[in-house]
Amino acid sequence: MHLRSTIALTALALVIAACAPSTSPPAASPVDSAAAGPRPSSSATLTVVSPTDGQSVAGPTVHVVISITGGTVVAATTIAIRPDEGHIHLYVDNNLVSMNYGMTLDQAVPAGTHVMRAEFVAADHVPFNPRVVTPDVVFTVAP
């Protein structure tokens, strides 16, 4: 009987510990490192060339084309933070789906209506201040 009580109390303690709020900070993401210091600004402008707003595309792969003016997309190995150099982050339905080092990408997107935007971020994957983001592009992927 003593063994059962010990096991039951141990199980109860584990359940309580699992339900308690975490005291450790969440894992750092690229955006979290922005607090480390002031962010540079960038005069670059970004445009989603394809798909276009309101377009219906055959799925499940969407050919994405991005255009940038006043900035250069650099390789992943670049670490210097410059206002005219960085990477492209692509979001579909508010989810980061790609950290791209080029201007074109074939992205798997399920059938349905979706919202896409792209962001030009510094070489450390942290946004410029102010952010360099395209307007939302609403498109539909046909099955």
Residue positions per predicted region:
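Bacterial N-terminal signal peptides that target proteins for export
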Residues: M1-L9
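Bacterial signal peptide processing site
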Residues: A20-S22
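Short, compositionally biased P/S/T/A/G/V-rich stretches that sit at domain boundaries
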Residues: P30-V57
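Long, low-complexity serine/threonine/glycine- and acidic-rich segments characteristic of extracellular
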Residues: R39-S41, G54, T61-P143
